[in-house]
């Protein structure tokens, strides 16, 4: 049976792991969100999130955005290639409803997969 958990092994945890993604990444972006990714040696994708206070002032809004992105990753993790992915949130995402944010992030997962696979 396929597991849909979001365990510790599916997360980017250390600053070194985040930093490695910023060197020569594969990009997929929209006006509100940018995904940066590099291939990893694991058999599964890993996710790191950054939601800057500069763009989303309130903690509850930052947490909502991260929750929606994590949930989308959890449900789509088996369709995403083995990449280390950092999600950068920019201006404009705070005004988005959860459903719209979910649609946007799923579109970006597909775009990233296409760019990685060629």
Swiss-Prot record:
<comment type="similarity">
    <text>Belongs to the RnpA family.</text>
</comment>
<comment type="function">
    <text>RNaseP catalyzes the removal of the 5'-leader sequence from pre-tRNA to produce the mature 5'-terminus. It can also cleave other RNA substrates such as 4.5S RNA. The protein component plays an auxiliary but essential role in vivo by binding to the 5'-leader sequence and broadening the substrate specificity of the ribozyme.</text>
</comment>
<dbReference type="InterPro" id="IPR000100">
    <property type="entry name" value="RNase_P"/>
</dbReference>
<dbReference type="GO" id="GO:0001682">
    <property type="term" value="P:tRNA 5'-leader removal"/>
</dbReference>
<keyword id="KW-0694">RNA-binding</keyword>
<dbReference type="InterPro" id="IPR020568">
    <property type="entry name" value="Ribosomal_Su5_D2-typ_SF"/>
</dbReference>
<protein>
    <recommendedName>
        <fullName>Ribonuclease P protein component</fullName>
        <ecNumber>3.1.26.5</ecNumber>
    </recommendedName>
</protein>
<dbReference type="GO" id="GO:0004526">
    <property type="term" value="F:ribonuclease P activity"/>
</dbReference>
<dbReference type="GO" id="GO:0030677">
    <property type="term" value="C:ribonuclease P complex"/>
</dbReference>
<keyword id="KW-0378">Hydrolase</keyword>
<dbReference type="InterPro" id="IPR020539">
    <property type="entry name" value="RNase_P_CS"/>
</dbReference>
<keyword id="KW-0255">Endonuclease</keyword>
<dbReference type="Pfam" id="PF00825">
    <property type="entry name" value="Ribonuclease_P"/>
</dbReference>
<keyword id="KW-0819">tRNA processing</keyword>
<keyword id="KW-0540">Nuclease</keyword>
<comment type="subunit">
    <text>Consists of a catalytic RNA component (M1 or rnpB) and a protein subunit.</text>
</comment>
<dbReference type="GO" id="GO:0042781">
    <property type="term" value="F:3'-tRNA processing endoribonuclease activity"/>
</dbReference>
<dbReference type="InterPro" id="IPR014721">
    <property type="entry name" value="Ribsml_uS5_D2-typ_fold_subgr"/>
</dbReference>
<dbReference type="GO" id="GO:0000049">
    <property type="term" value="F:tRNA binding"/>
</dbReference>
């Amino acid at each position: 049976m396929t597991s849909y958990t979001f365990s510790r092994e599916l997360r980017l945890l250390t600053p070194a792991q985040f930093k490695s993604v910023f060197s020569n990444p594969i990009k997929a972006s929209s006006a509100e969100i940018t995904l940066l990714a590099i291939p990893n040696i694991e058999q599964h994708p890993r996710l790191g999130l950054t939601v800057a206070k500069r763009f989303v002032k309130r903690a509850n809004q930052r947490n909502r955005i991260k929750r929606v992105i994590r949930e989308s990753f959890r449900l789509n993790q088996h369709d995403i290639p083995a990449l280390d992915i950092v999600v950068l949130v920019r201006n404009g995402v705070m005004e988005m409803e959860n459903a719209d944010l979910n649609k946007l992030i799923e579109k970006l997962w597909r775009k990233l997969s296409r760019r990685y696979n060629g």
